[in-house]
Amino acid sequence: NRSGFSSAITFLTPLKHKKFAENFYSLNGTPVDCVKIARNLLCPFEPEIVISGINPGPNLGSDAILSGTVGAALDGRNWKYPSIAVSVASFEIVDFSFAAKFISKVLDNLDNLKLENFQILNINVPDHNKFPDPKIKITKTFLNEEDCERNYESSDRKNLEDGNISISPIKIDMHSNSEYQAVEDWSKISL
């Protein structure tokens, strides 16, 4: 379980990988370690996409930025690969088969679906035992409760609660024009 690991990487601890089959490995590190080691050491070809997960427990709203699953997708995006984070909305004994089948269908149709480099999709799949016939909804991820409450019908949280598969495009941009203007005078401080 790497909940709350976000974009953490391992320092000062040796990382070990185990090969299960051709191009199938496990690693004792964080989700972001997995992307970096796969990209730099293990993958003999250029990946078309990074898929992080499937993990138990949803990654919704502000929790998404704390997620190791989403963190690994962000790292894939930093390598200029389209990336998908996938979670099943259950902390109990989780059956990943429905989510795996859904992602398999996504991959089968990848040429027909629009997923650009630098794009991240955060996909939350409902517990298939509780919601056996979900719809697919394109949703929004809100980082604060006020925005989520104002836009609840379109939120990832609401649609997952309704038993739907929530697909939220995520864009991370650290630059903010409005805040840039607000602190521009700071450069005039005498040293």
Model segments located where?
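Alpha-helix C-terminal capping segments
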Residues: 38-44, 73-82
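Electrostatically charged, flexible surface regions
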Residues: 98-191
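Glycine/threonine-rich flexible loop motifs
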Residues: 58-67
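A cross-family phosphate/adenosyl-ligand binding-site feature
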Residues: 1-41, 45-46
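Short glycine-rich anion-binding loops that position phosphate/pyrophosphate groups of nucleotides
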Residues: 30-31, 55-58, 128, 172
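Short, ordered loop/turn segments at secondary-structure junctions
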Residues: 1, 55, 88-91
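Glycine-rich phosphate/pyrophosphate-binding loops
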Residues: 77-99
